[in-house]
Amino acid sequence: MSNVFSLLLAREARLLFRRPAELANPLVFFAIVIALFPLAVGPESQLLQTLSPGLVWVAALLAVLLSLEGLFRSDFEDGSMEQWVLSPHPLALLVLAKVLAHWLFSGLALVLMSPLFALMLGLPARCIPVLLLSLLLGTPVLSLLGAVGAALTVGLKRGGLLLALLILPLYIPVLILGSGALQASLQGLPSSGHLLWLASLTALALTLTPFAIAAGLKISVGE
């Protein structure tokens, strides 16, 4: 079973490398949002520093959401998704490999580039470890929850708006905990409580969402 997971993970990685625009779009979006915000609110460093925890997390959330609409699109259109559903291997395991590959090449890249843009907003260097850890724990949850919506809307021609309406309410706890951890660190308070809750959400999402994604794909393929 682990061999199948590894093979599918490698396959998805190769496919993503062939479509560099899909990898670059959310990262460019994240960078543009962060770069434009100081132009909108003014150059006051104290104001930017105060707003930076929420801004970084909202930009990351929207960047992840932007990348999810086409997550299963190509597999659905070329018939690969039907083969997945008919495969003797657990569909939940197959979709977990696909979502993991997506996160490794988009979500993880976003996590790694976030300190640079956070420093641009005046976030102190002492807060960077909390920023990295919160995004490292939170962005997989965003990808997994978003994949549930992507699975349900993959058969729709214009499912982007519906995907956002379905998934954004589910993102609220992650947004509150992630930005809360960063805000606590900015104020010199312990952020371990927020991070532990984020870790719990990550474990819960890894356990439950693959089955929800598999069920959503079966519904979409069967329509």
UniProtKB/Swiss-Prot annotation:
Has keyword Transmembrane?
Answer: yes
Where does this one sit in the cell? Cell inner membrane
List the GO terms this entry assigns under cellular component, sorted alphabetically.
plasma membrane
Pfam families in the record, alphabetically? CcmB (PF03379)
Report the membrane topology from the UniProt record: Multi-pass membrane protein
Alphabetical list of InterPro entries matching this protein: Cyt_c_biogenesis_CcmB, Cyt_c_CcmB_bac
Entry's Gene Ontology BP terms: cytochrome c biosynthetic process; cytochrome complex assembly
Q: What family classification does the UniProt entry report for this protein?
A: Belongs to the CcmB/CycW/HelB family.
Q: What does this protein do?
A: Required for the export of heme to the periplasm for the biogenesis of c-type cytochromes.
Q: What is this protein called?
A: Heme exporter protein B
Q: Which organism is it from?
A: Pseudomonas aeruginosa (strain ATCC 15692 / DSM 22644 / CIP 104116 / JCM 14847 / LMG 12228 / 1C / PRS 101 / PAO1)
